Curated annotation (Swiss-Prot):
Phosphothreonine PTM positions: 122
Disease: Erythrocytosis, familial, 8: An autosomal recessive disorder characterized by elevated serum hemoglobin and hematocrit, and biphosphoglycerate mutase deficiency. ECYT8 affected individuals manifest hemolytic anemia and splenomegaly.
EC number: 5.4.2.4, 5.4.2.11
Name of the molecule in the record: Bisphosphoglycerate mutase
Alphabetized Gene3D superfamilies for the sequence: Phosphoglycerate mutase-like
UniProt source species: Homo sapiens (Human)
Binding-site residues, substrate: 10-17, 23-24, 62, 89-92, 100, 116-117, 189-190
Taxonomic classification: Eukaryota, Metazoa, Chordata, Craniata, Vertebrata
Length: 259
């Protein structure tokens, strides 16, 4: 039986989403479409009478800004927002900044799919010579984390994302849910997929088939042990959501004209 409700989402679209590049830990902002997605998400949640007690985000701007826009639409700007690197997007290592379609041309669609969607496959690590290395690791937000800078990831599989996310879920978010708080998690495609895997008990093999579009609220109903009661539900126009999911899945494919 359902006892708790949790809302999570992948942030609204950013410039690099539109350019089909691996964004990861680069602090790209929402574009105009992404801001509109976030506002629409807020409107949907308002129509469903959601009143949040606490919001959790990553330390990346696109996650935080999405949460702010949602709260603004809800008229709940006063609700506390807590940010942690443990909700950050998956660290794509050496792939950061690269175009997914170009990678599919160079390495094949299946390899790109494994890098993007599989559970255990880790991309090559980021090196100090990488054009975005200094931007990431010299950023002040990563000098005040709960782990030393040299212990932050240089590349991650989805398994790695779940392992760094779970302590934060268990120690910070889950206790608030168990207290009956209504929680919103504004995160990223892979940190959200990792949490869904844990809460829904999705297998290592099946998680590759879970794709999340930007800016769409996801409802999870949880039992007293914080396990999902049934599959997650996308809230909104289901036809539009399926089209958005297909768009995300096609990002790692070579367009027909180029084959």
């Amino acid at each position: 039986m359902s006892k708790y409700k949790l809302i999570m989402l992948r942030h609204g679209e950013g410039a690099w989403n539109k350019e089909n590049r691996f964004c990861s830990w680069v602090d790209q902002k929402l574009n105009s479409e992404g801001m509109e997605e976030a506002r629409n998400c807020g409107k949907q949640l308002k129509a469903l009478n959601f009143e949040f007690d606490l919001v959790f985000t990553s330390v990346l701007n696109r996650s935080i800004h999405t949460a702010w826009l949602i709260l603004e639409e809800l008229g709940q700007e006063w609700v506390p927002v807590e940010s942690s690197w443990r909700l950050n997007e998956r660290h794509y290592g050496a792939l950061i900044g690269l175009n997914r379609e170009q990678m599919a041309l160079n390495h094949g669609e299946e390899q790109v799919r494994l890098w993007r969607r599989s559970y255990n496959v880790t991309p090559p690590p980021i090196e100090e010579s990488h054009p975005y290395y200094q931007e990431i690791y010299n950023d002040r937000r990563y000098k005040v984390c709960d782990v030393p800078l040299d212990q932050l990831p240089r590349s991650e599989s989805l398994k790695d994302v779940l392992e760094r996310l779970l302590p934060y879920w268990n120690e910070r978010i889950a206790p608030e849910v168990l207290r009956g708080k209504t929680i919103l998690i504004s995160a990223h495609g892979n940190s959200s997929r990792a949490l869904l895997k844990h809460l829904e008990g999705i297998s290592d093999e099946d998680i590759i088939n879970i794709t999340l579009p930007t800016g769409v609220p996801i409802l999870l109903e949880l039992d007293e042990n914080l396990r999902a009661v049934g599959p997650h539900q996308f809230l909104g126009d289901q036809e539009a959501i399926q089209a958005a999911i297909k768009k995300v899945e096609d990002q790692g494919k070579v367009k027909q004209a180029k084959k």
